[in-house]
Amino acid sequence: RVLLVRRRHEPLKGAWSLPGGVVEVGETLDAALAREVLEETGLSVEVGPVVDVVDRVQFDADGRVEYHYVIIDYLCRAWTDRIAHGSDADAVRWVALADLAVYCVSGKAVAVIQKAKELARNRP
């Protein structure tokens, strides 16, 4: 299963996706990930290895870059199953991999989730 959040803000407002956010000045990537997951889901996690690195560029109606994110996806382990959505998420759910289509998760996110599944299978 995988943890999904329904985005409260743009980009992708209302869409189900993996938890994440912005790195604050002076913050390490691992610390930013742990903080964002805690803020969005109420979960404390053990940050594991990098699964994938993806560029996300979104253009406005005039063809100008509106958003450009470099997304680094990690495999994490949660210390508990109890979740509660925070201020950046409308909802948070544990979702079986077989049910991802019900949540209209993007193809890129599904690909990352599949990579994470394989990586987790090979971890002690």
Name the predicted role of every residue range.
Residues 11, 65-67, 88-89:
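A short beta-loop-beta micro-motif enriched in histidine and acidic residues
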Residues 18-51, 74:
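The catalytic Nudix box helix
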